Amino acid sequence: EVSVMPVKYIERLEQDLRKVNGSHRDTVCIDFCAGNDACVLTTMHAALRRQDISLVCGTGDAGKVSANGKIYEDAVAYALVRNQRGRVKTYKENIYQPMDEHRFIASKTDKKNYVLGELNGHSARQVYQDILKVTEKQILTQTFQNPFGKLNGDDTCIISIKEVQGNALVCFRQVNDSDVLVLLKLADYKEVVRDTIQKIRADFPRPSAVFSVNCLFRYKLFTEHGYMQEYLKEMSALGKHAGLVGYGEHYNDQFVNQSMTCVVFE
């Protein structure tokens, strides 16, 4: 019942945490969610943070998850993975940078349907078009280059545009009234990837495995730029690697778009 009351079964996660008896140094939570991601992550994080355990993974487009051979709708499936031979650490990669001259206050939002109505009191669609000089039809591909970012302290949560709805924009994650947003632009993504790999190597000279989630839009962007195979080759240098392409990425209590999240095992 994640769409209406994700907290209803939180005791199951609390019991599993006691059984695993892990810590932030050796345990990670990997989850797959069927919807209402932001609320689900906030709920799960309330239990995980007591032991400072990180969470990564994401969501797809089918609105279903599978666990132990059964398919569930309106649910979240998770696994608590404890590394018995070393540490674990999670990472989030952002290949965009803020356009500081384009900051906005969101309004006329529809939290349930992820609608962004206005930016600084003007049509969200028109503002986006005017700044980037694109047609309405081009908006859905321009978001690969220029998504929005929600400012969260020193961090930025990326927000992708899903579709145009009249003068509004429908996004892939929730936007609330009075949220502070900034328009983002594509950075030197090859350099960002190299920096991520260097950070992982510095933290884990001998990693045993990596599990990652890449956004579908990152996959499309890398493919269009002829970089996808090079990206996979560079990441494979870290060792054994498994992962998936998703519709939205999870990182602790954050539901983000157009990102890569991963967990590395020592």
Predicted regions and their residues:
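Hydrophobic alpha/beta core scaffold segments
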Residues: 1-266
